Amino acid sequence: MGKDFKSMVTRCIYVGKENDNVKKLKTATEELKDLRNIVMKRVKMYEDQQKLKRLEKVQVWLRQADVAIKEAEEMLITLMSSSSSNGSSMMSFHKLDKKLCKKLKEVQEIKSRGTFDVVVENSGIGSGSMMISNVDRDDQTVGLEAVSGLVWRCMTVDNTGIIGLYGVEGVGKTTVLTQVNNRLLQHKLNGFDFVIWVFVSKNVNLEKIQDTIREKIGFLDRSWMSKTEEEKAGKIFEILSKRRFALFLDDVWEKVDLVKAGVPPPDGLNRSKIVFTTCSDEVCQEMGAQTKIKMEKLPWERAWDLFKMNAGEEIVKSHPDITKVAQEVAAKCDGLPLALVTIGRAMASKKTPQEWRDALYILSTSPPNFSGPIL
């Protein structure tokens, strides 16, 4: 009876005196599990959607968190079984309590290191997104090869950081930009850590640009939406200033204050690049383009070849009247690759002279407006 009474007293002393630490360990372990799940969810999202690679420090932390959670849960089970055992001594409780305090500090310390601004990095496959465009098709690159090659060369030299592509709508600016973007990704980024595509258009929305950039660089913090524009810019600058990036801005109508958005200016040290498309030479000046590339309309011979490729040479030559009208239709495209490809493909199913004459009439009375990439 005395022995049982002593064990009961021992348990009462432990439960009464040390229960706070048990509660703290339970709480800290649950909080660590929640944080671990949040980090893993972020990592998996970027790995699955953008084929990025988790940072080594994040992987190490996840392993440490898993081990700490497992050991803490085992310790809590042991404590529960020990407190219900009649054979437990005051000495064994003291030993367990020392281990409990040590484990509590470990769990809290690991939890304190679980806040990551960035959880992923370039895996060598691509941190950007392939833009939708069948850029390997010959019918789309006729007349654009030289410009695409020139932009690509600018991407490989250190003395040109900002490149502006300008020309009238439909001349193929977005198509060239798409080609370079996809080529970078196909070449495993060619030394760039981030490849970022932003569609700008009219009425510049700096916040939208910041949100697009932060998604591409792997920054996903719950507090992002509550940050001010300046705070967002600071986070973007903090990350991009340490990495080499290629930023593609499509359809720029007016100056975009990239410094205000948090984008570090490209220079010979960071070797980053900013490439944008615009209809205006003036915008090129305002954006500080070090290299300006004007895209011209195609000369007639190349325009006619591009049109025939898309309409189908057999159809174009199938009837003398079709050939004559086809040349007039192609001329209405005014040397614009986008118009030549789009209308050419639309005419590929027209096999009678009358269908071609009808199309020519429509083009003559209601000329379409072409802009965007050649798809």
Curated annotation (Swiss-Prot):
InterPro entries: Apaf_helical, NB-ARC, P-loop_NTPase, Plant_NBS-LRR
GO process annotations (BP): defense response
GO MF terms held by the record: ADP binding; ATP binding
GO CC annotations on file: cytosol
Transmembrane segments: none
Binding, ATP: 167-174
Pfam families documented for this protein: NB-ARC
Signal peptide (UniProt feature, chain positions): none
NB-ARC domain ranges (all copies): 158-372
Function: Potential disease resistance protein.
PANTHER family: NB-ARC DOMAIN-CONTAINING PROTEIN (PTHR33463:SF220), NB-ARC DOMAIN-CONTAINING PROTEIN-RELATED (PTHR33463)
Designated name of the protein: Putative disease resistance protein At3g15700
